Structures are given as structure tokens and as C-alpha cells.
From Swiss-Prot:
Disulfide bonds: none
This protein's name: DNA topoisomerase 4 subunit A
Record-annotated site: Transition state stabilizer: R125
Membrane topology annotation: Peripheral membrane protein
Organism superkingdom: Bacteria
Function: Topoisomerase IV is essential for chromosome segregation. It relaxes supercoiled DNA. Performs the decatenation events required during the replication of a circular DNA molecule.
Site feature Interaction with DNA, where: K46, H82, H84
InterPro entries named among the record's database cross-references: Gyrase/topoIV_suA_C, Topo_IIA-like_dom_sf, Topo_IIA_A/C_ab, Topo_IIA_A_a_sf, Topo_IIA_dom_A, TopoIV_A_Gneg, Type_II_DNA_Topoisomerases
Residues annotated as the enzyme's active site: Y126
Limits of the Topo IIA-type catalytic domain: 38-521
């Protein structure tokens, strides 16, 4: 037996390996988060970007200066502030100079700085750079005491912790980065809109994100495009700080002679470029079999035929005058333009999702996902602090200068006596202080100035400067002593910057339906298979033998869906309080495991679907929750247009949504039709279907009364005089019994009667 003691956590010479590894990993993770990947809410910059801007300013590379070689700038950055590889610094410089990447480029790049088609920049020895005018928004106040500095990596120089941004740059140019355990995707926004929103929030701090979206309706991308995401979805994204917007290209239809026409694409979504789109069309019109396959599958053959039937020619006519100009010519002028454009959007990157994940370093120096109001409020807090520091810094300068000038004024009024004292004194500084009441600083200044500065003309200039500085001192004291006046000053400065640097919105915000390809396959019957763990797949045909269907380990069948309305071109709904609509053609077929439902729709908080539904819009379903409430809803009211779904059934915390039950049209006119509900305590109730409301959404009415700790577990709709009860005895034996409905019939909301079973209820259904 080993009797040696274990290393103690308090032993000064040892540390448990697990604790050391945990601490080391956390330190590494936070260094990546803070030091590389995430921007600051204060100035919108990552450390390398901040160092690039500061180094270029120190080199005097302002907008009006002569540009210098990029290699020289990179050397300055690496030598003084950023001891990493030169490629990381140069790549960051290149991105900051690309007008198709940043909405407001901060570097004016001369030479080849890459293209929107993915071409790389020339080597740093060939390109030149200087700052753009808008970079002044970050740098103009750097030497006015606005921000703190810290030593660089070797202590030889100081670098700023933040840049004193005059506008919320974190929203203007956005950011993208991947850290350890987190990532950020902040899109760019319009300067005018962001500034107006910040001013509105400064004037009225009680404004919420929905109010601020009157000024900032959506992102504004450098390349333009059209955002088609609905307004309520955009609001949800800005309120939560996470989501995705749907962006499509902008185009025009050019009419030609003899009824011919063509489509000209002039603006592309982010992350799309002309070369990528041409490659996608080539892949679809001239596809190659996948590795290990001898021929194309039917889906790819259908897509090839569709694209070849629609498109005659595609040309890239982009040039210096037209950064994006893609020309699409149809096979025939008789092709419907909407069908042509919809197919292009659905099959290429002309339409796609842009992720938004508003993660950044806050003023508390912690990474967090923030909503729109929080971002603007934190930046305003930062701006108020920087302006206050700037005012105090300037006031200190003014007071020092006033002190010097007041000493000179005393000397000017007694110039002859001053000269006499200086000539005859062994200690002129002490004598000047004694005779004229000067301070040591004033006496030092008098002894160092030239006599010509005491001429009569200089006296007039002296008095003028004194008066101007006293007026400025008064204004500065007003701003520092009155928060309202300080806020007015900030607003005035923001309005001036908006007037100087603001521009029109580039990205159109206009809601539209998502482009969906509907002609790649015939409308064929399919069977959908949903597993307990939320995996879905499809099989061709109806009435299939699924007994040999395999599932992933630990998973099993939850539900199959077929019937007269389950076809490849229909949209099944997935119920879980929210309803989600999916094009059945998007669900993979074959013998594989399928895909997680969560890859097709945005389930909230790891939820799994309760059931799948399909049918005509007028089809009705009974929706209910374990809390004993429910209502009848039309399938048409459950259609959700966005991946995040549509809230239909409201359930209290801790409650679950029960599987929906179909209610056929004949049920509403049949006086014998009953809704039947059962509980976890084996009680059941039946009541006429007419006692339950038809609603579009909500919590519904009480179906059955529940005791404390009891829940509703089963529902059914039946016109039969008997109900089929399937139960499991205490020893696991299965039982099937028929129960007259009349025995449990009562008014809606009553507690019903105990079922004549000894075990647990497994199923409640109509005998037919």
C-alpha cells in the first residue's frame, strides 16, 4: 500500500495536474478570445487591427500623406506592437483596405489588394498603404488623454488599450472571428442609421431594441444585395444577438430586340462572388459522378435537365466600372422570368443565409453575446467616458497656458522693472517671484522667453489669447459640470461626423419569400420516418414494410407519415408548441439514417419534435398540453415561413405538448363525436367536440381538471360508442379493453372517472 501523501492544493511547490491543465487551458482560451478573435464594443477593433491603425498613425500615414510600402508598415507593427508572423499582420491590413469586405475601409490600399472573386493580394513589397479619412473617427483623439495605454510586449513602447472611437465602429464595419468555444459574426451597418440610433438612445435611454430598429432596420452590406428576411425575424435576431438573415442578389431584366430578354445581376450577397456562381452553374449543367460512383443519381440528372432547359448562356462582364455584372440569357424568351430568376436564386449562391452572432468583448472585459440596445448603450457609456477625459485633458492644458500667460501679462505691465531685476540680481528667479508675485513656473517662463515677445504688438496678442482661453475654460467647465450639456456636445459631434462620413444605404430591405426549387422532381408519394432522437428521412411510396428499418444505436422509430397529402412537393409541419414547415423534397431519401430535423429548422433550446403533420390547409387538428388545456386549429394556421417556426401552442413551464389528433370535417356535424382525454392517474373524461374552441394559436380551454402532480397524457377524437384502451399491467402484461364512452362523459373541464385498469395507460384510441 502506498503511504506517501498526495500533493496538496496548498503545497507551494506542487500543483495537481488536472488543476494545472484546467488553468492553463482557460488562460490560453481567454488569451485567444481577448488577444485575437473578438472585437471590442468600444472601438470595434481586434488587437491586430488596433495596432495597425496606431502604428500607421505614428508613422504619419494620414489620408493626405504620401503612401509607403506595406512591408514598411508591417515591419513597424511587428517590431513595436505585434510580435507574430508578418502574414497575420499583412492579411489584416489587406482586409481593412478592401471596399468589398469592409463597409467603411480604414486603409487606402494602392496596388493589388485582392478581388471579390477570391484573388489574393500582391506581396507586401509591391503594395502601398495609408489611412483613409474615416480612420480619423478612431484616431483623432488618441493623444488627448481619452484612453489608457499599456506597455508593448517588451516594455519599450506604449500602445492603447482602446481607440477613442467617435462612432460605434463595431456595428459599422462588423467583425468575424473564431475563438476557443465561441465565434462572432457581426455584419456591417449603415453609418447614418447607426448614428441616428445612438443619438436617439442617448436622448432617451428607455428605448428598447424594437424602437432602435426604426433607425437600424437591418445590416447594410458592402456589396449591397437585398435582405428578404421578415421584419419580425430581424427583430428577434437583434433582440437575442443571434440568427441569420436571408440575402439575395439584386438584378435587372434587360429587354432586347424581338421580345428577347436577359437578366443582369449587379449586386451579390456577402460570401458570394462571380467566380463561385459560375462554378456552381458549371457543376449543375455539366455534373460529374461522385467519387466511387459510375453514374449520376436521379436528383442530379433532374437538376441538370432543368438548368439546361432554362439557361442558354452565362457571362461574367465585371470590370473596373462594373464590379459585379453577371449576364444570364434564357434558352427561350417564352420562359417565365419569375421561374427563371427563382431557379437561379434557389440553385446558386445568388441567394443565401448570412449568420449573425453578436459576440464581442464588453466594457467589463468579458466576452458576451449582446443585443442591439446593449451594444449601443455600452458604446455610449464608453463615449461619455472618453469625451469626459478629453474635456478634462483640454481643461488642464488651458489652465496651464492661462497660468503662463497671466505671468507674462504681469511682466508686460512692468517690463522696465523686470529687466532691471534680471540684470542686477544674483538669483533672478527668486527675485522675480518676490517682487512681482510670480510662481516658480511663471518665473521660469519669463527667464526663458525672448525679449521680442514682450513688445507692444505681442501684448495685444497676449490679451487676445487670454480672453479666448478664459472663454474656452468657461465652456469646458460647463460641459464637465452639466451632464445634459455634455450629452448635447456628444450629439453635436456625432451629427457632424454623420454629415461628413455618412452615405446612403446600399442593401435593400424588402421582405420576400425564400427561393425554392419546385420543378426538379415529380410530385411522388413518399413516407417520412421520424426517430425518437429527432432524425428524419424519406422513402419512396406508401404502405411500406418498415419493420426492418435500422436506426442509430440507442434510437428508435417515433412516427411515420404518409397518406393522400404526403408527397415530395408538399410541406409537412413539425409540432412542438411551435410549428415548422419543410419542403418534403429537402428531406433526404435512401437507406441512410437521414439528417437531424434541427439541420432543416431552428429548434429552440435543443427541443425535439412531438409529431409530424401534413394535409390540406383546411384540415383540423386537436392541439393540447400536459397541463390539461387545448384547442382545435386549422393546419393552414400552422404554416411558418421562417426556419425559426411559428408559435401555435402555448404551454406553461414544465408542461409538454401532446401529439396532435386529426379532427375530420364530419366530426363537427356529428352529434356523437366526442373529445376524450386521459391523465397520469388513469382518469378519463369525454365531452362533445363542440365545447372546445377553434383557434389559430394560444393556450386554449381547459379540457380536463387535474389534481396536484397530475398531468394529461392522452387525447382522442371519436364518434364511436366505445373507446379502445391499451394498458400495461403491473407485471408488464399488455391489455386491450373497450370502455363505453357514456361511462366517462361529462362537461368539459370536469375531472372525469377512473379507468378500470390496474397498470398504466399506454394508448387511447377509437376502435376504428
Amino acid at each position: 500500500m502506498n503511504t506517501q501523501p498526495h500533493a496538496s492544493h496548498t503545497d507551494s511547490n506542487t500543483l495537481m495536474l488536472g488543476r494545472y491543465a484546467e488553468r492553463a487551458y482557460l488562460e490560453y482560451a481567454m488569451s485567444v478570445v481577448k488577444g485575437r478573435a473578438l472585437p471590442e464594443v468600444s472601438d470595434g477593433q481586434k488587437p491586430v487591427q488596433r495596432r495597425i491603425l496606431f502604428a500607421m498613425r505614428d508613422m504619419g500615414l494620414t489620408a493626405g500623406a504620401k503612401p509607403v510600402k506595406s512591408a514598411r508598415v508591417v515591419g513597424e507593427i511587428l517590431g513595436k506592437y505585434h510580435p507574430h508572423g508578418d502574414s497575420s499582420a499583412y492579411e489584416a491590413m489587406v482586409r481593412m483596405a478592401q471596399d468589398f469586405t469592409l463597409r467603411y475601409p480604414l486603409i487606402d490600399g494602392i496596388g493589388n489588394f485582392g478581388s471579390r472573386d477570391g484573388d489574393g493580394a500582391a506581396a507586401m513589397r509591391y503594395t502601398e498603404a495609408r489611412l483613409t479619412p474615416i480612420a480619423e473617427l478612431l484616431l483623432s483623439e488618441i493623444n488627448q488623454g481619452t484612453v489608457d495605454f499599456m506597455p508593448n510586449y517588451d516594455g519599450a513602447f506604449d500602445e492603447p488599450l482602446h481607440l477613442p472611437a467617435r462612432l460605434p465602429m463595431v456595428l459599422l464595419n462588423g467583425a468575424s472571428g473564431i475563438a476557443v468555444g465561441m465565434a462572432t459574426e457581426i455584419p456591417s451597418h449603415n453609418l447614418n442609421e447607426v448614428t441616428q440610433a445612438a443619438i436617439a438612445l442617448l436622448k432617451k435611454p428607455t428605448l428598447e431594441t424594437a424602437d432602435l430598429m426604426q433607425y437600424i432596420p437591418a445590416p447594410d452590406f458592402a456589396g449591397g444585395g437585398q435582405i428578404i428576411t421578415p421584419a419580425d425575424e430581424l427583430r428577434r435576431i437583434y433582440e437575442t444577438g443571434k440568427g441569420s438573415v436571408r440575402v439575395r442578389a439584386r438584378y435587372e431584366i434587360e429587354k432586347l430586340a424581338r421580345g428577347q430578354w436577359r437578366v443582369i445581376v449587379t449586386e451579390l450577397p456577402p460570401n458570394a462572388n462571380s467566380a463561385k456562381i459560375l462554378a456552381e452553374i458549371e457543376e449543375q449543367t455539366n455534373p460529374k459522378p461522385k467519387a466511387g460512383k459510375k453514374q449520376l443519381n436521379q436528383d442530379r440528372l433532374n437538376t441538370k435537365k432543368l438548368m439546361l432547359d432554362l439557361i442558354d448562356r452565362v457571362r461574367d462582364e465585371s470590370d473596373g466600372e462594373h464590379p459585379v455584372r453577371l449576364v444570364f440569357e434564357p434558352k427561350s424568351s417564352r420562359i417565365d422570368t419569375d421561374t427563371f430568376i427563382n431557379t437561379l436564386m434557389a440553385q446558386t449562391s445568388l441567394e443565401g443565409n448570412v449568420s449573425m452572432n453578436l459576440v464581442m468583448m464588453g466594457l467589463d472585459n468579458r466576452p458576451a453575446q449582446k443585443n442591439l440596445k446593449t451594444i449601443l448603450q455600452e458604446w455610449l457609456d464608453f463615449r461619455i467616458v472618453t469625451v469626459t477625459r478629453r474635456l478634462k485633458f483640454r481643461l488642464n492644458q488651458v489652465e496651464k497656458r492661462l497660468h503662463i500667460l497671466e505671468g507674462r501679462l504681469k511682466v508686460f505691465l512692468h517690463i522696465d522693472e523686470v529687466i532691471k531685476v534680471i540684470r542686477e540680481s544674483d538669483d533672478p528667479k527668486a527675485d522675480l517671484m518676490a517682487v512681482f508675485g510670480l510662481t516658480e513656473i511663471q518665473a521660469e517662463d519669463i527667464l526663458e522667453i525672448r525679449l521680442r515677445q514682450l513688445a507692444r504688438l505681442e501684448g495685444f496678442k497676449l490679451e487676445k489669447e487670454l480672453n479666448e482661453l478664459r472663454e474656452e475654460q468657461g465652456r469646458l467647465n460647463i460641459f464637465l459640470g452639466d451632464e445634459n450639456e455634455k450629452r448635447k456636445l456628444i450629439i453635436k459631434e456625432m451629427q457632424a461626423d454623420m454629415k461628413q462620413f455618412g452615405d446612403a444605404r446600399r442593401t435593400l430591405v424588402e421582405e420576400a419569400g425564400r427561393a425554392v426549387l419546385t420543378q426538379t422532381a415529380a410530385d411522388e408519394p413518399i413516407t417520412l420516418i421520424l426517430s425518437e432522437k429527432g432524425w428524419i428521412r424519406s422513402r419512396a411510396g406508401h404502405n411500406l414494410d418498415l419493420s426492418q428499418t435500422a436506426f442509430k444505436e440507442g434510437d428508435r422509430l417515433k412516427q411515420t407519415l404518409e397518406g393522400p397529402h404526403c408527397f415530395t412537393r408538399r410541406h409537412p409541419r413539425f409540432i412542438r408548441g411551435r410549428t415548422y414547415s419543410i419542403d418534403a423534397a429537402e428531406i433526404p431519401g435512401g437507406r441512410g439514417d437521414g439528417v437531424p430535423v434541427s439541420s432543416l429548422i431552428e429548434l429552440q433550446n435543443g427541443a425535439k419534435p412531438v409529431a409530424m403533420l401534413t394535409g390540406l390547409p383546411e384540415q383540423h387538428y386537436l392541439l393540447s398540453s400536459s397541463g390539461g388545456y387545448g384547442f382545435i386549429a386549422k393546419l393552414g394556421d400552422m404554416v411558418g415561413r421562417v426556419k425559426a417556426g411559428k408559435v401555435v401552442m402555448t404551454a406553461d413551464s414544465g408542461e409538454t405538448v401532446l401529439p396532435p389528433v386529426a379532427v375530420y370535417a364530419s366530426s363537427f356535424i356529428n352529434p356523437d363525436c366526442k373529445i376524450i382525454a386521459a391523465t397520469s392517474q388513469n382518469r378519463a373524461l369525454a365531452f362533445p367536440i363542440g365545447e372546445l374552441k377553434i383557434m389559430a394559436k394560444g393556450k386554449g380551454l381547459q379540457i380536463i381538471g387535474l389534481n396536484a402532480g397530475e398531468s394529461m397524457t392522452h387525447t382522442a377524437v371519436s364518434s364511436e360508442p366505445e373507446i379502445l384502451i391499451e394498458s400495461e399491467g403491473r407485471r408488464g402484461a399488455a391489455h386491450k379493453d373497450r370502455l363505453p364512452v357514456a361511462l366517462i362523459e361529462a362537461k368539459r373541464g370536469k375531472k372525469g372517472r377512473l379507468l378500470p385498469i390496474s397498470g398504466s395507460l399506454k394508448q387511447l384510441s377509437s376502435p376504428k
